[in-house]
């Protein structure tokens, strides 16, 4: 085909085939990924990428920080070691005798100390609580040590493998579903961190104690802190043998009778009669009162029995030369002693080493005397129960256990007076006999010691020859009647019955000198039976005063006075505590100073309680009704944390500032008003 023909063909078809080009209106295939309604996939992907990046970054930072810390730690360890070695000077100290000293842990020391403690030791309540507390700590530590192995022993649950990552399209679908669902935020309940109230504290304490008691504590056997409750009224009035037995045990153990002062000495007329008749035996030991009206049983109850001091050792009694036998001899029992025994069930005074009571005194309640402290507590012997040495260790052979034969009192022909024996200045009152109790009667404040208990006759040994028993009313003075007010110490050897309750003469007659034979014995008048006077000692006397007094013991080392004399001098008196000053009354000064700022102070004297409450409610928003059920105990011991207190402080500070601002604003307004008034006037 030649070129010319081709051109012709082309020119022919040129107009026919020529169609102008236009943009296509047809919808092409979508260029983007199919969209899921409402979720922008690109945004989600970007978010995920960002998260991954952040996590990677955090992990890197953590790693770096750990490395730095490890480096520092290693340095610190080296430094510490170096410092410790530099400080230590006795690194190689192996004890003075070459045996290395074994350092015991605190826990071991505590346990050992428990084991070493004897059962007969006396503990204060505080000490016992402390040991309980330590024991509880030990138990806790022990439990904590035992718990970790339990935790390890549990088989570990196999770790759940992480779920396989979701496909991206599935993730988008899930997002579409979840996007309108509300997100549940779990509120972590905070344990209420409020301070406990007193009741809750008490309850918790009680439960802890209960829990502690359940665990046996074989190593620490402590004596119960309180040996005996105060006797009930029945116990006081009726003398019961069972009580006596308890006291006997106490005495033998050497424990002091804690309630000694609170027990009273009941006495019955019949007992007095028996006591008085007992002197028939052993004439040598019997002493007649000057008046001869009544003789006193020379035999003390424990006369022929060995007297034990609280610790259980027989205490030798220094019998006077006139009496051939010591109480420990136990050989001669006379009819009088049998008689003396009759009242015994009422109180085992014989078990007490120091019943210096005449046999008619037997009716005293057992607890009255602490072991070894005769009412005149044996001079020169430590009262074992009280653990205080009785001070007047005077040379006079006085009866050391009040229970020794009457003879001791007649020592040296009865010349020596038991004046010092009668509790010089209240020394060696029964151990607990505090300053507030009459010295001579350990039984209770102001009760005469005499066997008749309330009858107002002095017990022989305690009363001293003709010494009046302490003024029963004179609760606060432990001295002999000498020091007790209102009583004249009349003449040598005379006891004036002046303040003795029933108005009775202490000796056979108020004015009569006791014959020198029976120096220590005031003869009780048998014919005057009256009810024992019971006075309760409400206060516990502090041991400080007792000790200070006891140092005075034998009236500053004077020899015991002869029967003719009675020392009414100071040492027998309890020194007045110097630290004590009477509160002065300042009421007179109240009106002197006038404070202008106090004008707006709310004085609620005249107003009823509701008015006051109203004021308080207005000022503080305080409602008394909310707190009316709170006991004083609860309010006093309510627990409060530092945080709570800070809140309260902040609150009160805020209120205070607001009030100050208001005050200032009011003052400014007041000033403005005054200025305005002045301007108006002018």
Swiss-Prot record:
It is found in: Nucleus, Nucleolus. Residues 80-170, 187-533, 549-595, 641-682 are annotated as: Disordered. Residues 121-131, 586-595 have a biased composition (Acidic residues). Residues 673-682 have a biased composition (Basic residues). Residues 156-165, 435-460, 490-504 have a biased composition (Low complexity). Residues 101-111, 187-208, 641-652, 663-672 have a biased composition (Basic and acidic residues). InterPro entries: Chromatin_SPT2 (IPR013256), SPT2_N (IPR054552). Residues 570-682 are annotated as: Important for interaction with histones. One of its GO terms (biological process) is nucleosome assembly. It holds the Pfam family SPT2_N. SMART domains: SPT2. The modification N6-acetyllysine is found at residue 581. Its main location: nucleus. One of its GO terms (molecular function) is histone chaperone activity. There is a cross-link at residues 37, 186 (Glycyl lysine isopeptide (Lys-Gly) (interchain with G-Cter in SUMO2)). GO terms for cellular component: nucleolus; nucleoplasm. Histone chaperone that stabilizes pre-existing histone tetramers and regulates replication-independent histone exchange on chromatin. Required for normal chromatin refolding in the coding region of transcribed genes, and for the suppression of spurious transcription. Binds DNA and histones and promotes nucleosome assembly (in vitro). Facilitates formation of tetrameric histone complexes containing histone H3 and H4. Modulates RNA polymerase 1-mediated transcription. Binds DNA, with a preference for branched DNA species, such as Y-form DNA and Holliday junction DNA. Belongs to the SPT2 family. Interacts with histones. Interacts with a heterotetrameric complex formed by histone H3 and H4, especially when the histone tetramer is not bound to DNA. Interacts with histone H3.3. This is Protein SPT2 homolog. It comes from Mus musculus.
């Amino acid at each position: 085909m030649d070129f010319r023909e081709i051109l012709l063909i082309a020119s022919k078809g040129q107009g026919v085939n020529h169609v102008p080009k236009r943009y296509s209106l047809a919808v092409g295939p979508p260029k983007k990924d199919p969209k899921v309604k409402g979720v922008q996939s690109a945004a989600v992907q970007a978010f995920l990428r960002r998260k991954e990046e952040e996590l990677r970054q955090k992990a890197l930072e953590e790693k770096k920080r750990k490395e730095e810390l490890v480096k520092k730690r290693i340095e610190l360890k080296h430094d510490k070691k170096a410092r410790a070695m530099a400080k230590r000077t006795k690194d190689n100290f192996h004890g003075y005798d070459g045996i290395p000293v074994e350092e015991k842990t605190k826990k071991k020391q505590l346990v050992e100390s428990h084991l070493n403690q004897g059962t007969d030791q006396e503990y204060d309540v505080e000490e016992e609580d402390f040991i309980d507390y330590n024991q509880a700590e030990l138990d806790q530590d022990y439990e904590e040590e035992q718990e970790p192995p339990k935790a390890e022993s549990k088989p570990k649950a196999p770790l759940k493998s992480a779920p396989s990552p979701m496909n991206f399209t599935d993730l988008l679908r899930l997002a579409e579903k979840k996007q309108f669902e509300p997100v549940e935020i779990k509120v972590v309940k905070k344990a209420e961190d409020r301070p406990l109230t007193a009741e809750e504290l008490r309850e918790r304490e009680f439960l802890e104690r209960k829990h502690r008691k359940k665990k046996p504590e074989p190593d620490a056997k402590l004596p119960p802190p309180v040996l005996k409750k105060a006797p009930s009224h029945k116990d006081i009035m009726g003398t019961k043998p069972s009580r006596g037995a308890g006291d006997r045990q106490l005495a033998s153990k050497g424990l002091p009778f804690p309630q000694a002062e609170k027990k009273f000495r009941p006495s019955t007329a019949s007992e007095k009669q028996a006591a008085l008749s007992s002197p028939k035996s052993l004439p040598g030991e019997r002493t007649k009162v000057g008046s001869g009206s009544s003789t006193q049983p020379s035999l003390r109850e424990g006369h022929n029995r060995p007297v034990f001091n609280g610790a259980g050792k027989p205490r030798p009694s220094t019998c006077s030369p006139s009496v051939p036998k010591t109480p420990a001899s136990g050989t001669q029992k006379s009819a009088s002693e049998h008689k003396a025994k009759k009242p015994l069930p009422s109180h085992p005074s014989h078990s007490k080493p120091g019943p210096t009571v005449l046999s008619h005194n037997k009716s005293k309640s057992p607890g009255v005397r602490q072991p070894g402290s005769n009412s005149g507590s044996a001079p020169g012997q430590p009262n074992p129960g009280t653990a205080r040495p009785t001070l007047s260790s005077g040379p006079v052979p006085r009866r050391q256990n009040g229970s020794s034969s009457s003879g001791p009192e007649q020592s040296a022909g009865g010349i020596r007076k038991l004046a010092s024996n009668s509790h010089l200045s209240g020394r060696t009152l029964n151990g607990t006999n505090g300053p507030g109790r009459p010295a001579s009667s350990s039984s209770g404040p102001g009760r005469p010691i005499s066997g008749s208990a309330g009858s107002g006759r002095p017990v022989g040994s305690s009363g001293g020859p003709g010494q009046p028993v302490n003024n029963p009313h004179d609760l606060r003075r432990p001295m002999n009647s000498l020091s007790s007010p209102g009583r004249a110490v009349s003449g040598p050897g005379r006891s004036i019955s002046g303040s003795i309750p029933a108005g009775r003469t202490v000796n056979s007659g108020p004015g009569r000198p006791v014959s020198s034979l029976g120096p220590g014995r005031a003869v009780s008048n048998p014919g005057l039976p009256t009810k024992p006077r019971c006075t309760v000692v409400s206060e516990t006397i502090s041991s400080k005063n007792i000790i200070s007094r006891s140092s005075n013991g034998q009236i500053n080392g004077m020899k015991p006075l002869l029967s003719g004399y009675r020392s009414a001098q100071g040492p027998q008196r309890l020194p007045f505590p110097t630290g004590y000053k009477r509160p002065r009354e300042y009421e007179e000064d109240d009106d002197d100073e006038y404070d202008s700022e106090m004008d707006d102070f709310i004085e609620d004297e005249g107003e009823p309680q509701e008015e006051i409450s109203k004021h308080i409610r207005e000022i503080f928003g305080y409602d008394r009704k909310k707190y009316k059920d709170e006991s004083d105990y609860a309010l006093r011991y309510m627990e409060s944390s530092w945080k709570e207190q800070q809140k309260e402080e902040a609150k009160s500070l805020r209120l205070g500032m607001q009030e100050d601002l208001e005050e200032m604003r009011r003052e400014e307004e007041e000033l403005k008003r005054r200025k305005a008034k002045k301007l108006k006037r002018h």
